[in-house]
Structures are given as C-alpha cells and as structure tokens.
Amino acid sequence: MTKRLSPQLLIYGYAQGIFPMDEDGQIYWYDPDPRAIIPLDERFHVSSSLQRTIRRQTFEIRFDTAFRETMQACSERDETWISQEFIEIYSQLHAGGLAHSVEAWQDGEMVGGLYGVGLAGLFAGESMWSKARDASKVALVALVERLRAGGFQLLDTQFITPHLATFGAYEIPRAEYKQLLVKALQCSATF
C-alpha cells in the first residue's frame, strides 16, 4: 500500500511489472499471475465486422489530444480505481511524454478511447471507455498499429476480459511476463 503517487514512483512500478489501483482512497500495487497481454504480431485479431467499421471511417482517431478527458471518461463508472489523484499524476506523465491517449471522435465529440503508459518498448494499457458502438475497439486497433510502427514489443492489459480476448489477448504466467518486460525495457520505441 502507498499513500501517495508520483510520476517517478509510477515509472519505477511499471519497470518492475507492477501497477497501482486506488481502492477507497488507498493505493495498492498489483502484480497479477497470470498476466494478460495483447499480441503485437499476426495473432492480433480484428473481426470482419470491425474491419468494415474501420473502413467506413466512422470515427476520427486522434492521439494525445484529450488525455485528461480520456482518463476522466474512463473513471466515470459505478466502480472505478481511477481517482482524481490518479488523473493528476498520470497527466503529469502525459506532459512528460510517457502516458498517452487514443481517442475516437465523431462529429466533433469524443465518443471513446483509451489511455496507457509507454516506457521503452512497453505499453501498459490502463483503461478504455466508449459511448458509441465500437469506438473503443477502433481506438484499440489504432493503438496496436501505432505500437507496431513505433517498435513496441509488449502490450500489457493486466487482466483478461472477454472483450480483449476477441482481439487475441491471452494470459501468461507472471515469470514469462517479467521476461518479456525485461526485453521490452531494453528496446527503444517511439509512440
């Protein structure tokens, strides 16, 4: 348990393979076993219906234009681990070029997106939100394309969900995750 977060502490945590969550004002660090990842190779799967949505250009995808708003939208649910303190600290990481958002816009309004932390060749996906069908899914596809182009090695989703499994996300043992993390942290990648 930690009382306060700082950008430096977050960076240290991600480099160790742990991540924080706020529970009732207390910050706890997690290191799940197994750990979920999304493959950045040919195993990443996009359904044919989502491919059609992408081809129709239903959404305009933007990167890093509404980071704080993306985090705020991710926090607006019945149960959340994203406190205002988290929004402040991750926004500092964003200002330093280490936290990023992918936003789906429609008719001038942000209707979905995601955010996470990029550290060397690791991208730790933190949360997604959507108020328009497929908006966050299209944002995730755009994220994977961006990570591939930038030379990222590892897309950490922390936990598996049925939603992420449709993209090919899978679980690996903690020890295997730590090995992949070491390799990812040794490479240079650009968001």
Swiss-Prot record:
Its main location: cytoplasm. Gene3D superfamilies: Leucyl/phenylalanyl-tRNA-protein transferase, C-terminal domain, Leucyl/phenylalanyl-tRNA-protein transferase, N-terminal domain. It comes from the Bacteria. GO terms for cellular component: cytoplasm. The keyword Transcription does not apply. The keyword Thylakoid does not apply. One of its GO terms (biological process) is protein catabolic process. GO terms for molecular function: leucyl-tRNA--protein transferase activity. It is found in: Cytoplasm. It holds the Pfam family Leu_Phe_trans. It catalyses: N-terminal L-lysyl-[protein] + L-leucyl-tRNA(Leu) = N-terminal L-leucyl-L-lysyl-[protein] + tRNA(Leu) + H(+); N-terminal L-arginyl-[protein] + L-leucyl-tRNA(Leu) = N-terminal L-leucyl-L-arginyl-[protein] + tRNA(Leu) + H(+); L-phenylalanyl-tRNA(Phe) + an N-terminal L-alpha-aminoacyl-[protein] = an N-terminal L-phenylalanyl-L-alpha-aminoacyl-[protein] + tRNA(Phe). Its EC number is 2.3.2.6. Keywords: Acyltransferase, Cytoplasm, Transferase. InterPro entries: Acyl_CoA_acyltransferase (IPR016181), Leu/Phe-tRNA_Trfase (IPR004616), Leu/Phe-tRNA_Trfase_C (IPR042203), Leu/Phe-tRNA_Trfase_N (IPR042221). NCBIfam families: aat. Functions in the N-end rule pathway of protein degradation where it conjugates Leu, Phe and, less efficiently, Met from aminoacyl-tRNAs to the N-termini of proteins containing an N-terminal arginine or lysine. Belongs to the L/F-transferase family. This is Leucyl/phenylalanyl-tRNA--protein transferase. It comes from Herpetosiphon aurantiacus (strain ATCC 23779 / DSM 785 / 114-95). The lineage of its organism: Bacteria, Bacillati, Chloroflexota, Chloroflexia, Herpetosiphonales. The gene is aat.
